[in-house]
Amino acid sequence: MEKPKTIHVDKPWGSFDQFVLNETCTVKILTCAPGQKLSLQKHRNRAELWVALDEGVIIELDGKLITPDRNAEVWLPAGSVHRLSCAAQTPHPVRVMEISLGHFDENDIERLEDVYGRH
């Protein structure tokens, strides 16, 4: 599965960004509190497009750390090892819009590391 092309459209009143068109997808807003992080994980049956909604987002993707600007997109191919985190010194929670493409199932998660003791 390839990253969908984001389309930017200017309008007289401003603009909009279209992330997917007529595709089956699941959209969530992930919120990560200061000093917290999600599981280091991967999914077999879905890829994800993450859009940073706030400054201070930290994404680990296949062993590399990414600190995207607000509104920046990060493509997580199916099978990629990833996690979201928020630095302890960040004065606010950080949010990412997650657009999951492929077969979405909350059980399609392989946790490789989890600070909360989940498997």
Which positions does each model-derived feature cover?
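Short acidic-glycine-tyrosine-enriched beta hairpin
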Residues: D62-V81
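Short hydrophobic/aromatic patches on the structural cores and recognition surfaces of FHA
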Residues: E55, N71, V96
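Glycine- and acidic-residue-biased ligand/ion/polar-headgroup-sensing regions
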Residues: N45-G63
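Double-stranded beta-helix
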Residues: E2-D10, A87-H119
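Glycine-centered loop/turn positions within well-structured domains
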Residues: L38, A47, V57, H82, ...
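A short glycine-rich, His/Asp/Glu-containing loop-to-beta-strand
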Residues: P4-R46, I99
